[in-house]
Amino acid sequence: MSSAPRSPTPRPRRMKKDESFLGKLGGTLARKRRAREVSDLQEEGKNAINSPMSPALVDVHPEDTQLEENEERTMIDPTSKEDPKFKELVKVLLDWINDVLVEERIIVKQLEEDLYDGQVLQKLLEKLAGCKLNVAEVTQSEIGQKQKLQTVLEAVHDLLRPRGWALRWSVDSIHGKNLVAILHLLVSLAMHFRAPIRLPEHVTVQVVVVRKREGLLHSSHISEELTTTTEMMMGRFERDAFDTLFDHAPDKLSVVKKSLITFVNKHLNKLNLEVTELETQFADGVYLVLLMGLLEDYFVPLHHFYLTPESFDQKVHNVSFAFELMLDGGLKKPKARPEDVVNLDLKSTLRVLYNLFTKYKNVE
């Protein structure tokens, strides 16, 4: 026997019941929200009193918030990563590493992801310094990777410390994929080994420093200078008589310039060429190539260099070719970089010409 069907609950009644429930729920949520806002306001006030100089915490990646008490982590502010100069610096360094390691069939795509374990840094240093490091070839464990990094960085420090470089990286920062530390290391290596690259000057980034104190995350911003001028970066590990002339004896510098102009014109006049401005007229490399041919008494085939260079790369090619001719002539490797000469750096140009003067001053 089937039971009689229950009559449906009247619609208006259910609406009143729902509205009553939602009203109570809304009131409860509102009270909780007000209580939470008061609590947050009190906490904000307490933090403002305890750390008045601490800015509000910026958005950070979830993995960057997994910190122990009093632990600190740094990261580049996202806006700095979009800066054209920063992007150029990263690209130039990536291209340089891949050029150096082309025979190793190593391709680096992302600095922090490909360099943190020490494997690529080991190969890079061995190639640049012409040495062999006593480390395991492949290490998967964190301990093994840090041991390799320790060996590689100690070798780097032995090279850079006598030059006066400030070492702004560590095993933990490199292994922790700290891009700022990795960039500092690569810039130092590039300058020390005179990499044939042109680093963008005055690259500065905003770094977010996150610290955990009393269970709360606190952040602050600092400016980190990655590059200055090429001259200043080179000067960190190389000072010579020309530095002294530029800094302390401008009157003697004028005499040196006149002597070098007299020297180069003595030979370039044979081709009906004359120099009046050292920094500008040697910047494209043409006069340097022709001068080497005159000093060594040979004709330089025109297809070996650009007689009327137009681009920066063509000018760098010419100066680099002139440097090769100097090495073939028994001269030491020039202290200047081809890029510096092309960029109208007078001190670099004077170094190159003075190197020629000391050997060929008695050549007629």
UniProtKB/Swiss-Prot annotation:
Organism: Homo sapiens
Residue ranges of the region described as Disordered: 1-57
Residue numbers bearing the Phosphoserine modification: 7, 54
Name by which UniProt lists this protein: Beta-parvin
GO CC term (a single one): Z disc
Domain Calponin-homology (CH) residues, every copy: 87-194, 254-361
SMART domains cross-referenced by the UniProt entry: CH
Subunit structure: Interacts with DYSF. Interacts with ILK, ARHGEF6, PXN (via LD motifs), ACTN2 and actin.
Tissue: Expressed predominantly in heart and skeletal muscle.
